[in-house]
From Swiss-Prot:
Keywords: Cytoplasm, Fatty acid metabolism, Isomerase, Lipid degradation, Lipid metabolism, Lyase, Multifunctional enzyme, NAD, Oxidoreductase. In the N-terminal section; belongs to the enoyl-CoA hydratase/isomerase family. The lineage of its organism: Bacteria, Pseudomonadati, Pseudomonadota, Gammaproteobacteria, Enterobacterales. The gene is fadJ. It comes from Escherichia coli (strain 55989 / EAEC). It catalyses: a (3S)-3-hydroxyacyl-CoA = a (2E)-enoyl-CoA + H2O; a 4-saturated-(3S)-3-hydroxyacyl-CoA = a (3E)-enoyl-CoA + H2O; a (3S)-3-hydroxyacyl-CoA + NAD(+) = a 3-oxoacyl-CoA + NADH + H(+); (3S)-3-hydroxybutanoyl-CoA = (3R)-3-hydroxybutanoyl-CoA. This is Fatty acid oxidation complex subunit alpha.
Amino acid sequence: MEMTSAFTLNVRLDNIAVITIDVPGEKMNTLKAEFASQVRAIIKQLRENKELRGVVFVSAKPDNFIAGADINMIGNCKTAQEAEALARQGQQLMAEIHALPIPVIAAIHGACLGGGLELALACHGRVCTDDPKTVLGLPEVQLGLLPGSGGTQRLPRLIGVSTALEMILTGKQLRAKQALKLGLVDDVVPHSILLEVAVELAKKDRPSSRPLPVRERILAGPLGRALLFKMVGKKTEHKTQGNYPATERILEVVETGLAQGTSSGYDAEARAFGELAMTPQSQALRSIFFASTDVKKDPGSDAPPAPLNSVGILGGGLMGGGIAYVTACKVGLPVRIKDINPQGINHALKYSWDQLEGKVRRRHLKASERDKQLALISGTTDYRGFAHRDLIIEAVFENLELKQQMVAEVEQNSAAHTIFASNTSSLPIGDIAAHATRPEQVIGLHFFSPVEKMPLVEIIPHAGTSAQTIATTVKLAKKQGKTPIVVRDKAGFYVNRILAPYINEAIRMLTEGERVEHIDAVLVKFGFPVGPIQLLDEVGIDTGTKIIPVLEAAYGERFSAPANVVSSILNDDRKGRKNGRGFYLYGQKGRKSKKQVDPAIYPLIGAQGQGRLSAPQVAERCVMLMLNEAVRCVDEQVIRSVRDGDIGAVFGIGFPPFLGGPFRYIDSLGAGEVVAIMQRLATQYGSRFTPCERLVEMGARGESFWKTTATDLQ
């Protein structure tokens, strides 16, 4: 084989053929269309060598088997027929591997996802390592697609239809032991003996198919299957609100294969893959994937980052505890928490204990590893142990004087190189750094709650922040598993600035007589994970509304909340879920299904709760304000690019991913159409709906924010 080949054949002395996968010049192995000829050439050699006893596929990469297919291949397809042909080519290749007359074994270490798992499924047996990096899954649904190289047909037959549907419909990734339990792999071994075990398995007869559990056998029959697909269909429709066509097609394709046989199943899979690749939903989801990959490569500034060996945290509350957890347990850095109250330190330590203990219970972590990670976190009520911290994150109350005091104390009690990062959600970083002796080392690092789940962080340099401080803070955020966007130091930054008018408008509609559940249901149907009213309850009404006066002072009356409504709610001791009552009433702690709208909320805010607006009217009033503010943020350079704006909205507030973010959504509607809608709303409801100048100009010129491809900016 030529040197640049991604697949290399080596026949051992014991007549086992080892095919090594190593895509040249790439950290990750991904499958590309041009590899088909390489694999076919190897298959031809395998068929011609009658001495061979077995075949093993193994990766030369240190931490991945095959991470999936190269998504750019799909973007290059101009029609559904071209994408369908791509799927059929993949199916044919997998069929040729499966048809080899000798045992074929996949030796899996690291990520085995998408097309990688489909290749492993085409093999006759699979062995994987017990390493935490080893995960197996079919995540195509997250890109608005389905597995197109036989995965929808092979997986249900291997592990059972019910389990397979859960994996394919959610994109869920399995760890090694879960995969073994379900029968997805035949053995789990240490990395050091992976190839040896795979070779031994290849020397035996083909592994016989493992009998499915009784439940799966029942569900495979016509009656059980009909019941299962009806049930799963309802559940999926409720979860996706009909916004993700891929889930419906997955159900259809899997059922076709089981009811009509694999030939019909493969045909349906290829056709569905081709059609889904052309949907706006898949194009938007792929654009988010490319944008987030791009952001993760962005260093934030041209300067090299400073070393990070240890971190300090001020404040042991919910945010401080969450930040300590991701820093110690994901980055592996020692963390020192300072809180004036020992209870605060205990709270933060318990937070990490609870997270890690949950992993131990689910068998994702060994108890010894839990103890090792917990040992990285320590606490103090003074500044002992802070002298040599490289970066200190402040997570105290939203009070400017208090934060300025924290800066002064940190500068007195830490090293000259220490960075001070404030987890403020609204206060200008320039004001926090106003009296600093080292203002170039002060920066904003805004996490979202809950810290361990929310993928976004906003990094906010003020005018005097150094390039190295930016680069170092971006480096830490990435190590914490976050997607960082660098935003300008203006009131509300980016995420809260576009979120505030959206929530304000929802409250305004309440005062006009709309019902809480109607507003929330409409925005969930639109594609948000929760509605705006429920979101305010979840964040905390007191916390969520603190930013309104800050934004109103900075940007004027378009940020005004309906008069006296917020104060009436807070004066009635309504904080949301955290104290059991907000717009909704909540049952016992931890029982999320118990929430219900509190009818007393309507008289409290002087409303009737007799709704008259249609769903599209409710949605456009909330969403158009968010879009308009997002465009202002680009115009004022609050965000560095529309890429960051789309990522910030999707990862920070759950803007519908299938719409691709605010800027992709504006492009899909057309700037001119957005302007027309906003002008109509401005006539009906007031000047807050006046479209910003940039939007009007783009509408007049027929311009868009993105080019037509998934990856290119205009």
